[in-house]
Amino acid sequence: MALSTSSPLPLYQTPEIDGNTILLKVPWYPSAELEWCWAASAQMLACFFQGSLTDQCKFANLLFSGQDCCASPSACNQPIDLNEVTKLFESFDKSATFLSNPIEFEDIQTEISAGRPVQVGYQWSDQSNHVAVIAGVSQDNVGSLVYVNDPDPQFGNGWVYYSNLRLAYGDGTWQWTWTVNP
């Protein structure tokens, strides 16, 4: 899933909040390879759920059988089919529901409140795809915020308004969602 070359995320590191903030301890990791947003997102989620670090290349090995992505990561530096993302969840003993649409802020709140991060998929304006992880929710006097762990180092992690996330930070649209099954 290609990374965008758009401007940095309009992050709000210290939002004025109303006490309804929930932030899960999902670690942030950058993509080890340009096309590995999916592997970095899986790494974040696996570390959150299992408490141990799995190399991104091992997630690539799961999907590119016959290749040693740890010895030669550039050979595996490619996007994956969206249907393969659920296999990554299974690798850390979770199942996920794939939705071909964004979910409402209230639904994200429900997931985060239950201790389940949400994975989102964007389609950039150039038609390439990208995934990231929502790890928190909050509200300020302007609107609803989500805490995004975006594996693209130019975006990183931080607070962004939900309305801006729906527009893939102004450079596309949020098209897909993966929720972790209880």
Question: For each predicted feature, which ranges?
Answer:
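Sec-dependent, cleavable N-terminal signal peptides
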Residues: 1-2
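Conserved active-site-adjacent core of cysteine acyl-enzyme catalytic domains
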Residues: 8-11, 60-182
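Active-site nucleophile-adjacent alpha helix/oxyanion-hole segment immediately C-terminal to the catalytic cysteine
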Residues: 9-67
